[in-house]
């Protein structure tokens, strides 16, 4: 429930400064705030890279009522379909909602600025209906039914460059902050959970003489 605005190393502890909240100190900082984290610089200088793929994501609540045709097409299973450069993935059982994502090669004219206004539902609907003009009507039902969309450029972190071995104080990263990857098949989520499991075990199993050794392992 706090927004971190500054992270500073002190003599023995980190100082965390929060927006409109008291500052705190910590012996160890674990970065788990996503691929666009501004404090990754303490661990690595590697910059985010664009993959050239763009994703549009959305959720439809009560899909059995709001988009029954597409919901029945899923038949209780996850669905994936591709055609002419567009890939659609749908999960009809996402905590009571139908979650779907559409991936495609980023158009050249989007390189500097996305040409679809994601604050304007009609702008997104018009774009998608044009892209899906020759798809089955049940896919178009999905688009027509959606109330809001989120647009995300797909980004990754190149893994060739090692993390900094000399850090001012104990600090490490897990999840997307550590290894951002395209959002397919749940691999990013699974990797993040495994990161957390391994790190928590290293910090508590008593096998290491210091925090630095635990996070290095």
Segments from the language model and where they lie:
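Conserved FAD-binding catalytic core of PHBH/FMO-like flavoproteins
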Residues: 2-142
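Conserved mid-domain beta->alpha element of the FAD-binding
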Residues: 30-31, 148-217
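Alpha-helix boundary/capping residues
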Residues: 46, 135, 146-149, 203
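Generic secondary-structure microfeatures
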Residues: 60, 94, 104, 136, ...
């Amino acid at each position: 429930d706090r927004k971190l605005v500054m992270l500073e190393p002190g003599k023995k502890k980190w100082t965390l400064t929060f927006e409109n909240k008291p500052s705190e100190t910590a012996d160890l900082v674990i970065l788990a705030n996503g691929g666009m984290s501004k404090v990754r610089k303490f661990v690595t200088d590697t910059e985010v890279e664009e993959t050239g793929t763009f994703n549009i994501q959305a959720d439809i609540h009560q899909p059995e009522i709001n988009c029954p045709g597409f919901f029945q097409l899923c038949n209780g299973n996850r669905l994936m379909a591709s055609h002419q450069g567009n890939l659609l993935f749908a999960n009809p059982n996402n905590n009571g909602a139908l979650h779907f994502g559409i991936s495609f090669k980023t158009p050249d004219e989007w390189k500097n600025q996305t040409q679809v206004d994601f604050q304007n539902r009609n702008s997104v609907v018009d774009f998608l209906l044009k892209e899906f003009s020759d798809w089955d009507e049940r896919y178009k039902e999905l688009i027509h039914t959606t109330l809001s969309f989120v647009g995300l450029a797909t980004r990754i972190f190149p893994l060739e460059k090692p993390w900094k071995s000399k850090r001012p104080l104990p600090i490490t990263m897990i999840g997307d902050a550590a290894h951002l990857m395209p959002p397919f098949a749940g691999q990013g989520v699974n990797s993040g959970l495994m990161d957390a499991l391994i790190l928590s075990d290293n910090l508590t199993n008593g096998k290491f003489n210091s925090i630095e050794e635990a996070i290095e392992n």
